[in-house]
Amino acid sequence: THNHADKHDTHVGVAIKLIEAIRLLPADARPKKLYGCEVWRDLDWMTDEDKIPFDCSGHENLQAALLGVFDSQVAGGKRYDLATMGRRKAHATYFASHGTDETTGLNFGMDLTPLIEDPSLDINAFAQAIIGRFADEIKGRLAKLT
């Protein structure tokens, strides 16, 4: 699904409503995992430990065909189809900066599973904790180097 730190209100709304609906299910009927993905803003701002990488290497022809279905997002000079495929390739290269590429395409997800396992978790606080870990990583690096 979408994630609750998405750039678009409609996408955030979808993620929240889905989480709320899953929370209404009996625990044994809930999915074992729930991931929120992002295309527009991307999730490369998250710490590597928080990112869930999804290997998108296979079937590039099928991926391109599926992206091409959304004519309204491809027509008129905005080539979201090419940008999406390019971003996946870039993630595959940049994710492991000191190793050789293991994939030719990666997309990142946010693990939303804790939000469906524990309905008492606050959705906003969950997002802020992820942002906080990223901020702490940057603070630590700057403290070490300055």
Mark where each language-model region is.
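C-terminal accessory domains and tails appended to enzymatic cores
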Residues: 25-146
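Active-site beta-strand->loop->alpha-helix modules in alpha/beta enzyme cores, enriched
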Residues: 1-27, 143-146
